[in-house]
Structures are given as structure tokens and as C-alpha cells.
Amino acid sequence: MADFGKEAVAIEVHGVSKSFLNAEGGSFKALDEVSFAIPKGSLAVVSGQNGSGKSLLMTIIAGLEKPASGYIRTNSKVGLVFQDADSQILGETPLEDVCFGLSNTGVRGSRAKDAASKALKKVGLYEKRNSPSHFLSGGEKRRLAIASILAMGFETIIMDEPYSNLDYAGVKDVNRLIGDLSASGVTLVILTHEIEKCLALANKFMVLKKGCLVFDGTPLAGLSLGAETWEDWGIRNPLLSYPTLDSLVWK
């Protein structure tokens, strides 16, 4: 049971299910009785094949979807960084973009600019605060989305496929920020099938398969399971290409 009185748990998911209609007029379970807890300050990596339910689960946690059954409890505001970071950028410059998000919470004027500047410094974009947003690289756009979330006081951040379409330098920049945020106590949940790029940063690893949570443990425990288990999950054990858990991070 999550101990919210002591603020030990950032996210508690209990018995969450969600169904949708299929082409034949029946229904299928996109999520099936999923339960887990993520301790406050953790860095959790969630993996699984496309269609496993991981993105749907996280939109439910962020409050953008409702479960058909079960419940979600969070101990702080949860921000979601979408795979397509462009969809979250509404300002013509990074400073305008972060201020726009703050304006929706009632923070405007000099207070908004101060908070936005602080957040942009934290993600390494302050020097580009007045540059056109559309000129930012893919990694910079993800950092801008994170800056907007930080400025609004979110203490838990979910990132959906944060390495999608990034080159090596972009991955390193995102991982550097992930490491800094984790060290500062922010709870992070990373949804990715590219676990070789970040698993060494994590202290929690979960795998979804066809809407079911099939593994919930430490990265080392998951990596120690046999090849048949990974084949059943439909994802590739990165230790087939990398020597140790410590090497599973691009930096």
C-alpha cells in the first residue's frame, strides 16, 4: 500500500484496465489489471512492443485519459513530454513558450519571465530563449517541453520515447538533463523501446505486453532473465550488444 502520508510514493497504479472497440464490433483490453508503485525520486524505465499499452497507461496517469476500472494516485503534479515534442511548443521563442504555459496557471508578467528564465537555465536553453522555436533541434525541443513542465512546478515527469529521431549528440543532451533532474529529486518515468540508451540511469524497470504488466523490478533483475523471456516480451535484451548494465547509457 502506498504510504502517501510519508510522501514515499510518487505514483500508485491499482488494477487499471481500459478497453476499446475493435473492427469486428467487439472489444479488446488495451490495459488489463495493471498495478505498480513508483517511489518518489525514482527513475523508472518502461518498455514493451508498440501497442503494449505503455503510452496509454501514461496518458491515464497524467490525467489525459480515464481508466475503465482501477485507480491512480499521485503525490505530485504529473507532466507528460510527448514523443512529438513539436506538438507541445506553442510559443514563437522558448521564453514565450514557457511563459504561455505559466499564463494558463495564472502566472504572468515579470513573475512568468523570471520563472521561465529559471526553467530554461535548468535545461540549458537560456542562451536560446529569444531564438525561433522552430529552429531548435529535436533534443532541444524536448528540453523546452521539460522546461515548461518544470516552470509550472511539476515534480513528476513522464517522457514518451524521448530518443525518437535524435542523433547521438541529441541523445547525450537528453540523458545529461535526465541525470540532472534525477539528482535533483524529480521523479522520472521514461517510456522507450531503446533501453540500451538509458537503462543504466534507472533504478526501476517495467515491461508491458499486450496491456499486461509482465515485469516490475530492478534493471539488473530484468537483464538477468533468460533469452526466452525477452523474446516473449518482444524486446531485445541489450546485453546481447553491450557488456554490462553500466554500459547501457549513451553519454
Spans of features found by a protein language model:
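The feature captures the beta-strand-to-loop junction immediately N-terminal to the Walker
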Residues: 47-49
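Helix-to-loop junction immediately C-terminal to a conserved catalytic motif
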Residues: 62
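Conserved ABC ATPase "signature" region
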Residues: 110-128
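Conserved ABC ATPase signature
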Residues: 132-136, 140
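Catalytic Walker B motif of ABC-type/P-loop ATPase nucleotide-binding domains
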Residues: 157-160
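H-loop/switch region of ABC-family ATPase nucleotide-binding domains
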Residues: 192-193
